[in-house]
Amino acid sequence: MKFTVEQKDPLSKARAGALTTDHGVIKTPIFMPVGTVASVKGVHQRELRDDIDPDVILGNTYHLYLRPGTGILEEAGGLHKFMGWERNILTDSGGYQVYSLSNNRKIKEEGVKFKSHIDGSQHVFTPENVMEIQRTIGADIIMAFDECTPYPCDYNYAKRSMHLTHRWLDRCVAHLDKLPFKYGYSQSFFPIVQGSTFKDLRKQSAEYIASVEAEGNAIGGLSVGEPAEEMYEMAELVCDILPEDKPRYLMGVGTPINILKNIALGVDMFDCVMPTRNARNGMLFTAHGTINIKNKKWENDFSPIDEMGITFVDTEYSKAYLRHLFVANEYLGKQIATIHNLGFYLWLVRTARERILAGDFLDWKIKMVQQMDKRL
């Protein structure tokens, strides 16, 4: 993997870059649609490729391990071939999903014992087998196995958890060195900064992660319930420590406003279920604010869903029609809304990149944040 910073914004810490893997170039800043179980909910791969057009999508190690399982994925020749996606894929390590199973998991030095949310069967994740699972899944970018702390979090617990994450990281690195690539292309490895919302822990973790000299670095344990200002404070602190010549990935973030503000702090990569999940509930993101398409005010609005939108659904269908689909509980409504929201997120990060390259990102960001904060 090769990463190049092409341009830095003169008035913020934003940067435009390019990350090159064996499956192509990822232009940053980038938003990665979440394809948890080898599909982005409600979207065909053809629509994803031709209309939404992301350079990279995200898959989930926990879910793919449980279903379809590594045996099927290996037989298929890896996740790319299994799902018919020729561009880049990043897999998370399953740490966050295990964290979210708080009542059905036990964390020890060796790893995490957990019960499947599907059938209650018992499983164990260790740094070693998570590296093996991710080798078999075959994503272009794979993540270290970490523990994600909840919010709020006791300082002593956050400290113990951070040190555990660091010890697990050492085991990930040692084991990964023994595992050859499986499908004729290389994989890049990102460790994860933890430390909850404690400045000294975040600093310590960022310094430790930077010392590993991996191909990229991730920031985890944010967007788990903390106030947005705390998230920004932690992200800025960590970005200032992580090396400039490596991509920085803020995991699980966020709203369009969150994304723009974190780009200004030096973050390059984002993922979040928000555009797809909110779409299925009738919430549309636009450059002028958010729309609850189920509201009666859209019943007679025959204007396009979004005249500025980049996907075919934005101009082919009206707000009134989309509202009708939601009121009638037609699944097509959720699909249209999902394509719109993902298209908007990709438009947002692409335009941010253009503005960084043009040197006027900050003014544009301030204006966009004000506009997007409105309810239409």
Give residue spans per PLM region.
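A non-catalytic, amphipathic alpha-helix used as a structural packing/dimerization or gating element
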Residues: N129, I133-I137, R160, L164-R171, ...
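Conserved, mostly hydrophobic/aromatic
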Residues: G24, I57, D92, Q134, ...
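Glycine-rich phosphate/ribose-binding loops and adjacent secondary-structure elements
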Residues: H175, L179, Q187-I305
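C-terminal extensions of enzymes
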Residues: M1-A18, I26-M32, K41-G42, D146-C153, ...
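Surface-exposed helix-capping loop/turn segments at secondary-structure junctions
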Residues: H175-Y183, K246, A352-W364
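C-terminal helical cap(s) of enzyme catalytic domains, especially alpha/beta-barrels
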Residues: T70-A76, A279-I293, L346-V349, A358
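Glycine- and acidic
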Residues: Y151-Y155, K159, G216-S223, Y331-K334
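Non-catalytic, usually N-terminal nucleic-acid engagement modules in DNA/RNA processing proteins
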Residues: M1-K182, K296-E299
